[in-house]
């Protein structure tokens, strides 16, 4: 039981319905709904905005759902929100899902999954070009591996809308709230909420240690700004023609870092975790640095002999140095090793994202229409 400003409310407030003795809570429903909406948004973005094969994402969804739930639950124990030996690990319907852990685990598994699956030729993208061949203008179709940046830009920002929906589960569980205000202070500072969302306003009067105060609805603030960030990154940035691939991904980390840093520092003391604050700072810094690299540093490497040039020079040097210990190369001269390992010059005309994610597939598959 807990008490609001005017009356007492039973814990059943957070229960949507019962299945036998098992209570299905709004927290679990809203968290699942957030994941589903994010998945649908990612599929639509891949299919209609970027026009790349969405099948890899369909396959990843099964891994991603497990990753986000497992990661969020594990992170809850890491930051101290849940306690080992006290809190059941699989009682996720009762709360204790830390979204930062879900994001970290899901992106990590996504990097591994997409790195391998996008190397399959059936997922290559194709473009038709008019080229001169034997003094004739012919159409050729060029096939190449889709950059992981494309999938990242399409999928990762959709986490914001999932977070926005999932945060409402914290409202029904009476979690993620800020400092306490008296009824008079609440009306002065949050009177608009009583007009726009009277139910939310009423249920933010929470009794703690025998004292009933209005708790600042941090969940609502985060949900609101996540929706704004989602709209800006996914839709409004379409009008910024200078935005380069990878920018949306980094802006996700930047914006979610700012939002979470503000939210984490304003939480009630029982919901404030140092690890979450540090993680928010890392998201913010990582997004800022990553945005600079994707927009200004990486493009400067395009059409230049940099990444693979340096990599192969170092590789050739060390193989030549230790060739006597390598059966495959010990009978070759250093010049023969160089010719064998140095890639064709065509690799140097590829842009950075292609070089970075193409590994050893230097040559494009080409066929005539």
Curated annotation (Swiss-Prot):
One of its GO terms (cellular component) is plasma membrane. The keyword Transferase applies. Pfam families: LGT. It is an enzyme of class 2 (transferase). The chain crosses the membrane at residues 26-46, 60-80, 97-117, 216-236, 273-293. A 1,2-diacyl-sn-glycero-3-phospho-(1'-sn-glycerol) binds at residue 167. Disulfide bonds: none annotated. GO terms for biological process: lipoprotein biosynthetic process. Keywords: Cell membrane, Membrane, Transferase, Transmembrane, Transmembrane helix. Pathway: Protein modification; lipoprotein biosynthesis (diacylglyceryl transfer). One of its GO terms (molecular function) is phosphatidylglycerol-prolipoprotein diacylglyceryl transferase activity. Its EC number is 2.5.1.145. PROSITE patterns: LGT. It is a multi-pass membrane protein. The keyword Isomerase does not apply. It is found in: Cell membrane. Its main location: membrane. Catalyzes the transfer of the diacylglyceryl group from phosphatidylglycerol to the sulfhydryl group of the N-terminal cysteine of a prolipoprotein, the first step in the formation of mature lipoproteins. Belongs to the Lgt family. HAMAP family: Lgt. This is Phosphatidylglycerol--prolipoprotein diacylglyceryl transferase. The lineage of its organism: Bacteria, Bacillati, Mycoplasmatota, Mycoplasmoidales, Mycoplasmoidaceae. The gene is lgt.
